[in-house]
């Protein structure tokens, strides 16, 4: 995706407020061999771009003063109660340097899984994005998680998903294989209790 930016020389909170009143958004781009650069964006353009998933998880082409530069969205500051973008951070992308970022998960075939069709289970998406590292050329817009074989009461782990070539999951702590989705069977607790009661009754000898 492409977006337009303009270099800005005036900094400070007062200057930022003036920009926002004029329908502009203060931003910064950093990283790589160049110094951090303060830029400004059109609010309407960046607001609508931020509503698209791909803007958050793909290499972006920034059009700045007649030149194009590859960047990655790093953070967005929103107004506390208004639909207003206050500030945006971008990172320059070096084709030969690995990225460390998050990508969304797309869950498919859940409605066709045995968990739903046979057990009427409720599927919970435990994790909705993964932290990964990869070279820019290998960065996926999303990672697909197929739930087609999920059974009632079962779960899908990261090890059940084939990551795109060149993509490595960044684990936190000891959880190298997190649960991505699980299937909760309705009334499972009650059914289990009934089964336990039946089993206990069966083991009790008749008087």
Swiss-Prot record:
InterPro entries: Rbsml_bL25/Gln-tRNA_synth_N (IPR020056), Ribosomal_bL25/Gln-tRNA_synth (IPR011035), Ribosomal_bL25_b-dom (IPR020057), Ribosomal_bL25_C (IPR037121), Ribosomal_bL25_long (IPR001021), Ribosomal_bL25_short (IPR020055), Ribosomal_L25_dom (IPR029751), Ribosomal_uL5_bac-type (IPR020930). SUPFAM superfamilies: Ribosomal protein L25-like. Keywords: Ribonucleoprotein, Ribosomal protein, RNA-binding, rRNA-binding. GO terms for biological process: translation. Part of the 50S ribosomal subunit; part of the 5S rRNA/L5/L18/L25 subcomplex. Contacts the 5S rRNA. Binds to the 5S rRNA independently of L5 and L18. This is one of the proteins that binds to the 5S RNA in the ribosome where it forms part of the central protuberance. Belongs to the bacterial ribosomal protein bL25 family. CTC subfamily. This is Large ribosomal subunit protein bL25.
